[in-house]
Each structure stands twice: as structure tokens, then as C-alpha cells.
Swiss-Prot record:
Protein encoded by which gene: moaB
The family this protein is said to belong to: Belongs to the MoaB/Mog family.
Organism: Staphylococcus aureus (strain COL)
A Gene Ontology term for the protein's cellular component: cytosol
PANTHER family for the chain: MOLYBDENUM COFACTOR BIOSYNTHESIS PROTEIN B
Protein name, UniProt field: Molybdenum cofactor biosynthesis protein B
Role according to the record: May be involved in the biosynthesis of molybdopterin.
GO biological process, alphabetically ordered: Mo-molybdopterin cofactor biosynthetic process
Length: 168
């Protein structure tokens, strides 16, 4: 891969945040709130209409993601439902929608999780990223540790570059 300078976009990046949980609400959703705050700190727009919570149900997840794919959004980040529990179905809902999977994201996320956060428990993560036409989707665990790691180490440093690549 060639060298890439930091890409500056001539517009505001727009994101949507979807928390997948049977137990969280807007007051207790630390993971989704953390994603929103970290994005907004980098001037990424996350409007109230583009932050919501759905149950751990494949149809609910797919319906919300498809709705946002029709809107003026650059990136969708889902939190929660990426493990191996019976109710963890985010990956099953999101992966079939992807036009292209960004395999390196999941690989790097699990590696960094192992080294910097949860040790061998990283093998339980099925975090995934990919594209749907000219939009990005990242599905990450809902813990604030996982959110910070994914956003600070992987997503935010490459977000503008990824969007630039999708739109050229």
C-alpha cells in the first residue's frame, strides 16, 4: 500500500450510532454514549435522530441499519451483540448487508483487545467492519473499554481516509 497523508474532507462527516441491547436504555447506555462523545470530539456529526437503541433481535438491527443506509450518513457504528451468547446476533444482522468486508478491522481489533484490554477474552469478539456502497459500518462490542479501543486506535485515525476512498 502506498503512503497516504492525513486526508482532510471538505465537509462534515455524519455518523449514526446503534446500540444493541436487551437491557440498556438511553440513561444506562455507556457504550453508545461513549461512541457518540468520541466522534463528536472530532467534529463528527451524530444527531439525536442518529443515535438509538434496539433489542438483540436480528430483524430490529437489520431494519434500523437499512433505514440509515438510505439516509445522508457516512458511517454507522453498532455497539453490542458481537459476542457468542445466544442473543448476540448483531454480526448475523450486519454481515449479510456488507458489499465489502474490511477484514483487517476485526483482526486488528482482536489483536489490540488481547494486548491492551482483555487478554485471551478477545477471542470471544466477532467485531466486524465493511462497506455498503459508499457507507461504512463498524460493529463493535458495547463495553466502554472496547469502544474506546476501537474508536481511538482504529476508527477515528482512518475515518476520513476510508470515506475518501469510498467516494473517489
Amino acid at each position: 500500500m502506498g503512503e497516504h497523508q492525513n486526508v482532510k474532507l471538505n465537509r462534515t462527516v455524519k455518523a449514526a450510532v446503534l446500540t444493541v441491547s436487551d437491557t440498556r436504555d438511553f440513561d444506562t447506555d455507556k457504550g453508545g454514549q461513549c461512541v457518540r462523545q468520541l466522534l463528536q470530539a472530532d467534529d463528527v456529526e451524530v444527531s439525536d435522530a442518529h443515535y438509538t437503541i434496539v433489542k438483540d433481535e436480528k430483524v430490529a438491527i437489520t431494519t434500523q441499519v437499512k433505514k440509515w443506509l438510505e439516509e445522508d450518513i457516512d458511517v454507522i457504528i453498532t455497539t453490542g451483540g458481537t459476542g457468542i451468547a445466544q442473543r448476540d446476533v448483531t454480526i448475523e444482522a450486519v454481515k449479510p448487508l456488507l458489499t465489502k468486508e474490511i477484514e483487517g478491522f476485526g483482526e486488528l481489533f482482536r489483536y489490540l483487545s488481547y494486548v491492551e484490554d482483555v487478554g485471551t477474552r478477545a477471542l470471544l469478539s466477532r467485531a466486524v467492519a465493511g462497506t455498503v456502497n459508499n457507507k461504512l459500518i463498524f460493529s463493535i462490542p458495547g463495553s466502554t473499554g472496547a469502544v474506546k479501543l476501537a474508536l481511538e486506535k482504529l476508527i477515528k485515525p482512518e475515518l476520513n481516509h476510508l470515506i475518501h476512498e469510498l467516494t473517489k
